[in-house]
Each structure stands twice: as C-alpha cells, then as structure tokens.
C-alpha cells in the first residue's frame, strides 16, 4: 500500500500531462498529407503539398475552422504501392481524421481501404485510376481530379479529330495507372475507327528500349501514346529520336514532370500531354494565385489547385457539420462546393460529376502551352 501511495503523485502528474496533451491536440484539426517525398515522382508530391499548405495557411490566417487551426501532417508514401498501407496507417496513428491523400493511383488503390475501415475522410488530388473508387465504392474517399475513363477518351478524341494519325501505337508501363489509362485510350480509339497497330507494355526501370522502338518502326506508326510516368517516357523520347523514329508522342498527366526534359533532352519538343485545365485562369482565383506567390510557391501545375480545393472542401464541410468524419462524408456527398477548380459535386462513389482536362504541348525547353 505504501508503494502505491508513493506512485500516486507520479500517476497524477502523468495524468495531468495526458490531459494537457489531449487539450493541445484538440486545439487543432489535423490533416494528413501522405505524398511522394522520395523517389522519382516527388514533383507530384511537391505540387500537392504546395496546394494543400497554401490553402491551410490561408484558412488559418482567417482564424481557422470553428476557431481551430488546421495542422498539416506530412507523410512520405514514395509513390510506391508497397508503402501505401504503412503510409495510410501513419495518417491513422497521427490522430488525423482527414487527409489530402496520395498522388499516385497504385498507392491510392491500396490505401483507400484503410481510410474506409478507419473512417477517415480522404481526398486525392492526383489519383485518376477508376479502381480507386470502383473497387470498394467508398463512402469516405473522394477526388478533386477526374478519372482515366474521362481522361483516356478525351485524349483519344483529340487524337482522332485533331491529329488524325494513320497508325497508332499505345504503350504502357504494366502498372495500375499506366496500363489503365492506356487501355482507356486504346478502347476509345477503336470506337472511333482509329487503327491501333500496336498495344504493348514495357518494363519500368529498363534503360534500353531499342526493342520496342524497332517494333514501332516496323509497324509504321505515326503516333505513340504512352501510359505511365515520366522516367520511362523520357527514355522512349530520347532513344526514339536517337534511332531515327520521329513521330508524335502523347501521354497522360503522370508524364508531366519537369524532370522529363532532363531525361528526354530536345526530344521533348512537341510532346502532347493531357492535364487538368489551367485553373489559375478561372475567374475569382486571383486571390488564390496571389496566396501561392506570396508564399513563394508555384500555382502552375497539374495538382496544386486540386490539392487547394481538397482543403477548401474539408474546411467548408467541417465548418458546416463539425469534425465527425461520418457527418463530413455525408455532407460532401450532397453538397456543391465553390473551389479553386470551380464548382465541385460528388456522385455516390466520391467521384467528381464534372472535371475539365486539356491538352498541352511541350517545347524543347520543357515549357508547356495549353492548346
């Protein structure tokens, strides 16, 4: 008994510390931001962090949400599917009930189950694979970007109606995102009676694509669409140019990385890429663009504005119904939001009812122009 009495002050002190910690935690609303911070796709994570942090800082400067500041929790997922569940679990363990979640589709497809099971409201500003929301039809998970079954047909329509090639090759990286969007393009081209002479996967990480380039030459294609990320496309562009294959290349938003010019060199000139429309030009976004620039962040990229919009939607929803994730998710499913990407409405699966893609052209210096 004396031993227990000696512990009582310690126990009381520990209890006081725990209560103080809980009180401190309750002073903020945590938002997990799991993104690629390492690996070859860090630029996508940088863009999403830039958008999310700018929105958080803007909202906090105006007093936060219901008197509480938003607290960003930065987590690295490496754009690696094997890191998906560990990264999502770090969001859970941080105490965050909300997340601006994951740039890469392969990661998101695996991680979305964690958010659904734990009741965490997640919004991805970057993952376009239909599998994200088709696999389990989540209630707690949403997007602020379109799907590949929107992006793929959009690209195919541009190819068929504007570029009008004689023969097309559709290549992909055999991964969730790349093969998915490539299949969407192939199927949409077939519906428009465009001749897809070659549909084939390449291996991620290979350094020599001479074999597939030889096949492209033999097939006599005049346009190559590649589904995947920039490292492989960069090598395909450079090696095709070096081996005398001068055809039009096109890809999805996952290829639109400034590191592409360092890999492809001058062969990047003329590359076409589908990306979200330039939301910096939307009427009413002048103050958002200024907030980016005041924070010395670039608003001009594929994912900055979708990430900014994700935070806006979370903040507006919490302000309306409180911090209960179930109520926030219910509110998001039935509400129209005014955001940095325009009006946002969700369907039953958390997909956007409308999203605008556009085609951009790259010059030899890696600068892009919306067509």
Q: What residue ranges belong to the model's regions?
A:
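N-terminal signal peptide c-region/cleavage motif recognized by signal peptidases
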Residues: 20-22
